[in-house]
């Protein structure tokens, strides 16, 4: 083992990439009772015959390999060669050579080896060889106890130059076998096979190994002749033993033949009818050529005198195992025949053999493991959210359009746990898990992070900080209103004068600007008038020397005196008496405004009253009376705003918060409702119908419409298979095409085109000089069959809803279909039409558990199906296997001195692979609450993709005299509450509701505090005690949630927890979609004051320390006010 690890560490990267292969072993996440083992295998590239004979398997796995595999096993090696003295090809132109060869680790299992390896916690590693005359392809097999799944994640196996990485993959199956995306548990009882209608049928891959053991109980040839009805003699002296099988890579050993085990019977039947099993072709070897030399007999072992085994010699790519055991000897004569097909046909009595290893599909009866719902939790982590999904029975599918779902799964006890990260929390997180749509409301995560941050900042008083934080962190306007209310109460006596002073300073600044601007405008108007008068009477005010326009007469006289003498009239600086020089000086002169300022001083300003600026200066913002008035007014306004904003914004169409009670409708005319309802939504309508003549007479009306149920009568078409198409050319020089039986003749689906006696000099290999003899057989066959889905054809489809009406004391229910009505004495409820994507004749294909939804096929092949069509390879229930047709044309391609090659111009891609490539072009659908049999499927649509047109008419002709009194009496008691107030997830209130005076009563129970109601549940009460759970969203820290019926509520209420940093549970969309309408009034001003009072009382009763802390802060602000703004002292006159 250490040499293997050292070699693996020293090899280069390129070598490792070229010679490392994967072997994947699927493990369920629970350990079965019994000696359950898991197995896997992998195909390896070819080696030369000499290298193959030196192979020894090695393992670095922490489970020891079974010791018996290290023993040397001897076999009879049979090869063929051309005769040296033959000039033309015929049945005598080649010969066989027998010899003894030894292998270590070849697939020659001993009696009780697998059972001992389970008890001793050892692995069984071995290999098989499929070879021709020059090279062999190894196939490595491994059987380990199921406990290895809990002990290892991966390990390394070495075989010659190759390294096999064994990867233990956890499936989401509890104990079953993963097939078609579902977990299948086979049943070994024969009675289940006889009553197939009661059980499911699945095609499971099985691997079997021949165990040679001399004992009269193991007369396998006798069992074969009995099963085939042959009349062979001397079966007692033939080989004895049995096959040990692992079903689906995960099962306890199955022993064949065994009459009491149906699984063994199916395996034994498969070995007899298709003894070669699945081929060993590597990818790219689907198209290959065989050159058949002919049939020949050999001596097994080579020391016997007579020939006792018939074989067929070939040259080309080896596709089937070269190991077998002679059937004619009870001594266990093992055979290694590279380049020869041994005769495995058991319909003849002599010269045949049995396969050492068999691999193929068998049909078994059993049941599928139930699909359990998921629980999804999320918590904030950095900038995003960290989420976990749990499911009791495993998670078969989990996706999210906005999260990074890892494929590395972990298991915790009997539940599967998958962790994933969501990068964004600015929108709700949507997760599809086990066919259910879960929504994580990230608003609650943000609330929790806010509470955590505030509590951490004020960690000296964690209780007080938490109580304040849960109010401040409510999202939206309500949180800001809470912050404003607390700040005003605690620090308003300091902040009000400070804010008022800041506002006064800003106002005085603008008032000063306005006052200065007005004075300047008045002075400019005076200058303009002076200038206009001067120009009218004496002329221009422009200096003749410097051309400067003067504003006053005094300025003009100064220019006339100074400019002529070359002086500046403003600063008396000497300059050249030219216009250019003087104008340049004016640009830098600092005294050009001298005459303007002198004039401004002589102008007497207009007397202005006190004005805005003076009024602002005189405002007494430090007055205690002013501060008290503003503090009280702000508290009242902010309390009203806080209460009005305390209602949580609803998610349409879930719930609209309203006040207590039920709306009333005066029946002047018939009451008619006409609307469209999504298929996933429930609808509740509740009103009091009042007499238009007498308002005191009323009748209670309650209508409940359940979500849409879809029921389809179907025909079970069976299982759809994926497959690989193989094209093989088989050429032999002489004889008719029917002379040889090729291994693919035993495949479930095959087709052959023969070109008999058509050889010519231009279409012959060099060793086949004959002309007009022999055969070229072009064979098509399907292998690697894998069931991928289950198909149902819709015969008829029905959309229905259950409708219940409570009219007074009258209670009636009915399930109505599309275009159907429910008519009572006073009400008529109709489904006028349904918008749907299902129609008669469609085919529903489920590529996995039916709980995960399926695909709708409008054009599903029904009769003549070609390979590549939907339904090309089908396994119908209780009917023979259906193979596709191959409509393409064959062509025999010939070249001089080469073996002919067959070409096929038809489709070579399976229908399943074509559907996967274009799956986005098909309509899909999700399912919830699905129930199914072979004849009928019923489910509900969780996405609301379908819609019903609903029409409700309530007649105005109501006998109010007799119907006004309702004898039903309802008693209410709040029993328990879970969840949090003010959060996006909400709370669940459990109510104990008692009903007396009538047997049944359809009504609604609400979850309310003193002011408004946050959720309701429509329920049919039975006489006695009833438990009702109501889900609501909203409320505040002071809300005491009660169970209410109409305006009557339970005597006591319960307070929900505060939103915190706990994990947020996902909401099932199917449970979340309901439309409730009872016409109750919205919350008004009185309701707001009730909410404010309830909040204050909640703080006092819940955590009175918070109130003390707030009062201490208020006192501190008053002291600070007296220091910063002391009271003005008035002197005595």
UniProtKB/Swiss-Prot annotation:
Disulfide bonds join 27-149, 61-155, 173-183, 208-245, 232-349, 374-433, 378-387, 403-422, 450-473, 733-768, 737-775, 749-883, 763-894, 778-902, 804-813, 821-830, 861-865, 968-998, 991-1043, 1008-1013, 1044-1049, 1083-1087. Residues 514-531, 586-603, 590-601, 609-623, 1120-1133 are annotated as: Binding to the ribonucleoprotein. Residues 507-626, 1125-1133 are cytoplasmic. Keywords: Disulfide bond, Fusion of virus membrane with host endosomal membrane, Fusion of virus membrane with host membrane, Glycoprotein, Host endoplasmic reticulum, Host Golgi apparatus, Host membrane, Host mitochondrion, Host-virus interaction, Inhibition of host innate immune response by virus, Inhibition of host RLR pathway by virus, Inhibition of host TRAFs by virus, Membrane, Metal-binding, Phosphoprotein, Repeat, Signal, Transmembrane, Transmembrane helix, Viral attachment to host cell, Viral envelope protein, Viral immunoevasion, Viral penetration into host cytoplasm, Virion, Virus endocytosis by host, Virus entry into host cell, Zinc, Zinc-finger. The chain crosses the membrane at residues 486-506, 627-647, 1104-1124. The record marks 646-647 as: Cleavage. Residues 609-632 form the ITAM domain. GO terms for biological process: endocytosis involved in viral entry into host cell; fusion of virus membrane with host endosome membrane; signal transduction; symbiont-mediated suppression of host innate immune response; symbiont-mediated suppression of host TRAF-mediated signal transduction; virion attachment to host cell. A motif (YxxL) lies at residues 613-616. Residues 755-775 are annotated as: Fusion loop. The keyword Metal-binding applies. Pfam families: Hanta_Gc_C, Hanta_Gc_N, Hanta_Gn-B, Hanta_Gn-H, ITAM_Cys-rich. One of its GO terms (cellular component) is membrane. GO terms for molecular function: zinc ion binding. Belongs to the hantavirus envelope glycoprotein family. This is Envelopment polyprotein. The lineage of its organism: Viruses, Riboviria, Orthornavirae, Negarnaviricota, Polyploviricotina.
